[in-house]
């Protein structure tokens, strides 16, 4: 297979449809940094099935879609198409019928990628296998991205093995082996499950055999139980007959006891009435005595609290007086301390002032002396620096002049030799122009125009098809949405119609169906009429509205009559005329003004009736719900009337859109047949033009290069001659300089003396400044202390004066508080006497009431005992009556059960049981116990499978079938394991064969690149070639053999390049992309690199694409394409000549 062209649309920076032709030989791609050259390589990897966003330099796969620029909006999809020539029929079987394969990958934002081969949608794995079988793919080592050489150098041996696998063509084997292993694991899992199922069937078969034995025992016990059940029935009938006779006699005795206890209970009630009549006067006296006692207790508690408060107030005032005396003493002490401090500060302050006034002002004099000494020091040091600089400059000038003279002479000689050689080479090159080139270009232009027209027509057809598909999808979505909405409305309408259908059992329509309130008043109407709305209007109904005359009521202000707000039949007019609507806030207030028959409601459903009844809105009202349902039904039916025509219109629009889509697809199929013929003609014309352009470009490039070289060498010769003259003059001047060393020594001695004098002057000035500043700071500190103590003395005097006034007030309040406790104590004593008298009165009244209560309680207990006895008698009689009824019913039920179950009368059953041979007890309990024992034994068996025998036979047949299937599956597992071993063996054989070939090629290419030396590849880390790592050992000329990690950067790059090209020679891939592989190489190595490219082109059918910035590499290409970004953020692909390529790179 051969790659022919790559077409991009909306991929990264290639927003416009762009086609890149992949021709035989060497194709170069040039352009400035950041213009999108590497996007071509990433598009090729992407269309071959790359699934890593990181490998695409993207955060997510949606990032490969054009994200927009300043002038262009973002796209929502991107697609890349790779056209492959399959004339040799080497594609997989499902695609091998077509001579041309067109692989398309399309991604829609947020929806993922789809793959198509010749228009048929396929899986990503199918695309990956297609390229893997051709020894290429998204991760092929033949696609060398930026930095991949460095990654190969730094890769682990295990990771390097991948290039061997690609060269050996075992990448597809890996995938097939993985699929076989998956099938093997699935088969082993199925085998394990089959064995589990077989074990389960064996267990189930054993269980069914046990169940068959249990079923046999179950049948035997059931037969015996049926024989005993007749004896149980007869024993129950005998007991029921005897129980009926006993209960009849007990009921007669209980009736006589009820009459006696009723008379005793009536006498006890008379005693209770007499005792209760004597108690009200005693209760009144006890209440009065208790009230008086409570009032006196309150007064006593108040007096006690007042006495305690007076004592506490006296104590507080005493404490305040003591505190004031202590504060006066403290302020007096503070005043004395301030006076003492002021007396101590005054003499010291006068002394410091005298020192400050007496000290002479020597600062300016000393500052002037220090300044003069510093100026002298600076002048001396400046003189030393000037002399030292002159000495150093003269020495340096002498050395530099000699070096420049030698260098200028050598440069002039080199320039003259190079200029002569370049002129000789330029004379040998002459421009030649082929007249046939113009005809070839015209044919190429015509073919290109024809292809552009065919593609434009195809693009228009594709656009029309996409547009039609979008319109059809929109129409389908709209039709589905309208249909769904209409269906929901119709479903809701049917449900509401069922809920609101008349529910009267008599068949008469309720009044609710004839009532229609205004919007928002449904809850008010339901609150006003409630369940009365379910009554009919037909007089023949069990409950109906007959209508009545009623005067119109007068409503209070704020109430609005409900009748005008409701459409209702005349029969409801009287009821509605007595209902008004109010707000919830006014309902409670206006309810008091209602007359009989009137009621108020709110819009929320609250109800206020004239008789005081109130029902809030949250109370459930079925009538309100039905009114809301009827209102919603009317709204839904109106919406259905609107939606039905719209649904019909969308259906018609969908059919029209589908017709347009089919027409667009037919047109697209017709237009797709046009571009292939035009492309074949264009390919032929392009090859002829490319041949002429290559020859002319090589000649022009060589001539231009030599002209530029001659011009550069002539300019360099002029510069070299001028530099030689200047160097000679500078060297002569440097020899005439004098000796300045004695002057420099004298200047250094004078500078040292000036520094000593300046230091002494600065020291004297600093001492004087510090002493004067210290005296000034001490003076300021003493003045601040004197001011502070003065303020303290004034504040203490003011506080003492204030405290004196507080003490006078506190003494007066204390004197007044001395008399209050004694007066309050006398009041408390008087209240205690009154409290004792009231307590005695309350005790007397309580005793009398307690005696009366005791009498009433005794009578009550006697009445309750009599009533209890009467009740017990009645209960006993009722119980006996019930027992009698139960005995009669039980006797009848047992007799009926005998007739139903045994088909005979009880007496006949007794004779039948007596004649049975079954040994059972004589009493009913014993017979039932025996029956219970038999039933318990049967129940102990548990659930019984009566079909166990048939199921056991069925399970035995299934088990035999499953054993046969297990044998077949075991054979399949053995075959899969053998197949995997065969794949592994084939992979090892092919990998070792490829290793030997690649190793030999690598050694040959290494020696060609380095001009000698040795190199070899080794498999390490495992004896199995499929698991081993690949290590590179190399020995450039003049060095020892070592691993590649110990070589220099340039040597590593050349060695890695030799390995990559060695892979090509072993199993050439259809395409090789080299993204700036020559970037780390110098000019000599770039030339070797290009020679190797020429050799690979000669020896293989691989088509090489080199992305480069190197002019040498450009000049060795068969054709050049440029990637530009004239519009910010948008890449364009153009054909260029060599001079244009150099300008692009310089940009």
Swiss-Prot record:
Keywords: ATP-binding, Coiled coil, Cytoplasm, DNA-binding, Nucleotide-binding
Domain of life of the organism encoding this protein: Bacteria
Residue ranges with Basic and acidic residues bias: 765-790
Record GO cellular component, one term: cytoplasm
Induction record: Induced during early S phase.
Gene3D superfamilies: P-loop containing nucleotide triphosphate hydrolases
Pfam families: SMC_N
Gene ablation phenotype (knockout): Mutants show abnormal nucleoid morphology and DNA segregation defects. Mutation also causes a cell cycle arrest at the predivisional cell stage.
InterPro entries: P-loop_NTPase, RecF/RecN/SMC_N, SMC, SMC_hinge_sf, SMC_prok
GO terms for MF: ATP binding; ATP hydrolysis activity; DNA binding
Residue ranges that the Swiss-Prot or TrEMBL entry lists as coiled coil: 173-221, 288-327, 365-496, 646-698, 743-880
Oligomeric form and interacting partners: Homodimer.
Entry text on domains: Contains large globular domains required for ATP hydrolysis at each terminus and a third globular domain forming a flexible hinge near the middle of the molecule. These domains are separated by coiled-coil structures.
Name listed for the protein in its UniProt record: Chromosome partition protein Smc
Organism: Caulobacter vibrioides (strain NA1000 / CB15N)
Gene coding for it: smc
